[in-house]
Amino acid sequence: MNVAVFCSANNALDPEFFTLTRRLGEWIGRGGHTLVYGGCDMGLMECVAKAVHDSGGRVIGVIPIRLEKGGHVSSYIDVQILCETLGERKQLMLDRSDVVVALPGGIGTLDEIFSVAAEGTLAYHDKRVIVYDMKGFWNGLESLLDGLQQKGVMRGDYHSRITFAHDEDELLRMLA
């Protein structure tokens, strides 16, 4: 299985996020799965790539040329795919993945979550995003989406495109 992971490239995060991210990476690697991610050598991105690599899994890094020129490419990548834009990176990652997981992240991660969900709503693909709600990180997003659903501004039930996993066991059940 190819697992796309969207997440933060920030190093200044809760240390427990790194622990949980490492465990996900180990699960991906030990299971013989492939990580598809943004290729950066910082934050949770580097953490998950290292864990997959060290656990025997394969790592595909989809890297914007701007990042590569800046010297922020992970050394744990087995297959490197260069692209021009963030939009192109999202599409290349989606095309190469069977399932999508979002870990804690910022504006870029939100963009990735919503792009996958919006494209799925319009039948460009049939994938959903599993949002791993580490320590309640995504509680505000889940509340926002529930509120939008209640107000009737969303077509259909958003849960068919975005699902929240509130702990590691729930996440691994969804991935199995």
Q: For each predicted feature, which ranges?
A:
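A cross-family phosphate/adenosyl-ligand binding-site feature
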Residues: 1-96, 135-176
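Short, structured loop/turn "capping" segments at alpha-beta junctions
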Residues: 59, 124-127
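Active-site/ligand-binding-proximal alpha/beta "capping" segment
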Residues: 88-123, 130
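Flexible, glycine/proline-enriched loop segments at strand-loop-helix junctions
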Residues: 103-104, 128-132, 159-162
